[in-house]
Amino acid sequence: DARYVREWLSAQAASGYVQYDPASETFSLSEEQAFALAQEGSPAFIPGAVQIAVAQFKAIAKMAAAMRTGLGLGWHEHDSSLFHGTERFFRPGYAANLVGQWIPALEGVQARLEAGARVADVGCGHGASTIIMAQAFPASSFVGFDYHAPSVEVARASAAKTRL
């Protein structure tokens, strides 16, 4: 509802969390706020971390039972917001660092990938890192592995969208 959104934004502006321009009657975020809260590709994007926290709260009863019984809690037993949040949280860091910083820091790895290597991404989740590497190193072959079938389905769909 537009009225509720305006009231909420007005409260945020009164608290100094957003800016209000009375001339245009618009609200805005600072560049830094937008970088962290609204630009999904930014390396500082934090809403994925919020999804992870929400999933942890949803799992409190399961975690308590796991601690009481010693039976553990499988990755697959978590709320789906954990899997989506994990991908949203880590993907920007992978995009910003994996190809440009981390791989070059590993002696000889970049040259092998450029020449054509076979790579297994174990625990690939939604496939963000696998896709980033496959796009950067087309001479190499990348296969993602994960025991969580719904995550593998998301990874396959993402790979198909990028035509990998």
Where are these regions (language model features)?
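Class I SAM-dependent methyltransferase "Motif I" SAM/SAH-binding loop
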Residues: 123-127
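Class I SAM-dependent methyltransferase SAM/SAH-binding core
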Residues: 118-120, 130-164
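Conserved Class I S-adenosyl-L-methionine-dependent methyltransferase catalytic core
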Residues: 6, 10-117
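Generic recognition of stable, solvent-exposed alpha-helical segments in well-folded globular domains
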Residues: 58, 81, 128, 147-150
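Key DNA-contact positions within bacterial/archaeal DNA-binding proteins
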Residues: 3
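Short, flexible micro-motifs
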Residues: 73, 128-130
